[in-house]
Amino acid sequence: MMVRASGRPIFQDIRKLSFDYVPERMPHREKQREALETLFRPLLEAHVSQNAFLVGQVGTGKTHVSKRFVLDFEREAARKNRTVRHVLVNCRQRMTDDAVLLAILKTWDERFPDRGFSIPEKLSALRKHLERSHAHMIVVLDEADVLIRKSSDLIYALTRFDEEYEAPRGSVSVVLISQRDVLPFLDPATLSTFRRSNMVEFGKYSQEELVDILADRVKTAFFPDVVSEDVVQLIADIAAEGGDARYAIEILQKAGELALDENLREVNPEQVREARAVTHALLSRESLEGLDRPKRMVLLAIARKLEKKAYVTTGEAEEAYAVVCEEYGANKRRHTQFWKYLQDLDLLGFVVAKPSGEGMTGKTTIISLEDVPAKPLIESLEASLAR
């Protein structure tokens, strides 16, 4: 996928900067890949289910390493005449047990009905697929803390799958991915299946490590001599505070797009600075696109109210939400549903909702944006809703 500026190509393959792209080579994550391979070796050698827990901050490679691992593991299993399949479910996008289980079943049968089956019935359907295919399934739950904080029973059901269904020929392994250690929040029964020794930790990337990661992406995504070493160093310096490779790659892509828009022959430091100004590490494209449309509309309403003030009440936010619904031709949801959306946005870290303190009449909830500037959030949401 080649993209050209005036007289000179910029992007050789912009897809290599996508969040969905899984590179073969993952600099500075060899240790974590080897740890997963060691943990799951008994699955191939003795047909024993395994569970693992990957923990680390945003942009430290957890999701990419897990994707690379399951793809490689499936190939290795095939060489040993074993059938292993995987599914990766983002729990920010599917926040209930039912939604997660439906996503798992859709990997076996895309026509499986969205409604009409209870969770036990869905688990039974999964068992039948596994038995019929003589397969083992690795279920990767990304952002698993969202599900766990909602008191999920599904993780327990999956980790005890063999016991629940009398050890079917196909069985299930579970990989949990989270930014924080959620083991203390698991109920004792579920916790017993996740040993501390099964935890794989992902530390922040250093500036030098970010340089290596960016250099790899530059080679595959851009044409030669478009991105200099100085530009790579500058982006790594910017992202080094959080050690966030995802943020670094997003700045790299945005800087390239700005150079393209300005008909430049190469990416220069000014495009990097401009890209940083419009790219917030906590509000990546992936995060916003993970929200369904109604939640994005609620978030837009809140952001607009908070552009010039520190806090907004739920009543004020709901009034602004009604205006946004009218603007985008959407049906306004009832207060109960609005409140649920607000709780989800709080749980996901987009807003902070807390009881009002002194100086306010009656009991109400006040909402704030503590980590994200309102203006770029508004612009990103408006662009997203316009698509």
Residue ranges of predicted features:
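A short, basic N-terminal segment
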Residues: 1-50, 72-75
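Walker A/P-loop nucleotide-binding motif
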Residues: 47-72, 93
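Conserved catalytic segments around the Walker B and adjacent sensor/switch elements
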Residues: 53, 76-92
